[in-house]
């Protein structure tokens, strides 16, 4: 009598979902969101097709659920900072940590790539949710730099956008002669972030110093016109 085929141990619903998600994560890191196939996920997860389709109507439905695991990704970058978020050191650490995390060939990097390449309900939602999660931080910085001649929202957009592009471009060619795949290249970008943030905060302090000088000159009886010209450089 032929031996009965050994059955695989029955897995719980939570375990199956975890297996499917882990398989998708590995496949996405390898091929990206645009090239992923259900058959690849099934093969990696070592499940039957019926198990996948019992839970997800199609690949689009699965990906819509899967990317929700990354809705709070930017918020996670802000966790356990060594310095207050709105301090010079805090801002520096946020942007430096951002490029380090993206440089790990993460699913998040592939999600950014997918958002740029493909417009659909899922990519629109993930991009908008990230914007919503970033805005409280931007608002905190805007309060700090209020009336300081510094458009901090625009400056942080340039830094974050630059970090995103450098990360997305890193496997195509160096950028401005800098290869962030190398320790030397990454170090140069980290130092540039530190320098850029330092200048932003120096401008903030300079504005406060000028206000104090203007106030003292006014108290000393110096005319408004002279103060405007000498302190603020206005004609």
Which residues are covered by each model-predicted region?
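Amphipathic alpha-helical segments used for helix-helix packing
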Residues: 102-124, 169-176
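Helix-turn-helix
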Residues: 19, 27-61, 65
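Short coil turns linking two alpha-helices in DNA-binding domains
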Residues: 45-49, 223, 234
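Hydrophobic alpha-helical connector segments
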Residues: 65, 79-104, 108, 147-156
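Amphipathic alpha-helical packing segments from all-alpha helical-bundle domains
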Residues: 74-78, 120-146, 153-154, 187-191
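Hydrophobic/aromatic-rich alpha-helical bundle segments in the mid-to-C-terminal region
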Residues: 141-196, 200-207
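N-terminal intrinsically disordered/low-complexity leader segments
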Residues: 1-14, 207, 221
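Generic hydrophobic, amphipathic alpha-helix propensity
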Residues: 13-25, 41, 66-70, 74
């Amino acid at each position: 009598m032929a031996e009965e085929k050994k059955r695989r141990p029955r897995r719980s619903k939570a375990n199956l979902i975890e297996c499917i998600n882990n398989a998708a994560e590995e496949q996405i890191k390898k091929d990206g969101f645009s090239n992923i196939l259900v058959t690849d996920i099934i093969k990696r997860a070592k499940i039957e097709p019926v198990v996948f389709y019992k839970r997800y109507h199609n690949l689009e439905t699965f990906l819509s659920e899967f990317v929700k695991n990354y809705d709070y990704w930017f918020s996670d970058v802000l966790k356990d900072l060594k310095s207050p978020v709105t301090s010079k050191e805090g801002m520096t650490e946020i942007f430096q940590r951002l490029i380090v995390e993206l440089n790990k060939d993460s699913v998040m990097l592939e999600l950014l790539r997918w958002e740029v390449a493909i417009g659909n309900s899922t990519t629109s939602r993930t991009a908008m949710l990230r914007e919503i999660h970033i805005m409280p931080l931007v608002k905190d910085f805007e309060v700090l730099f209020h009336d300081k001649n510094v458009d901090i929202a625009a400056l942080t957009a340039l830094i974050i956008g630059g970090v995103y592009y450098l990360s997305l471009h890193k496997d195509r060619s160096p950028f401005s002669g800098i290869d962030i795949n190398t320790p030397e290249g990454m170090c140069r970008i980290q130092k540039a972030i530190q320098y850029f943030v330092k200048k932003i905060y120096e401008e903030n302090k300079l504005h406060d110093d000028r206000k104090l000088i203007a106030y003292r000159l006014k108290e000393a009886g110096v005319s408004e016109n002279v103060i405007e010209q000498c302190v603020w450089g206005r004609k």
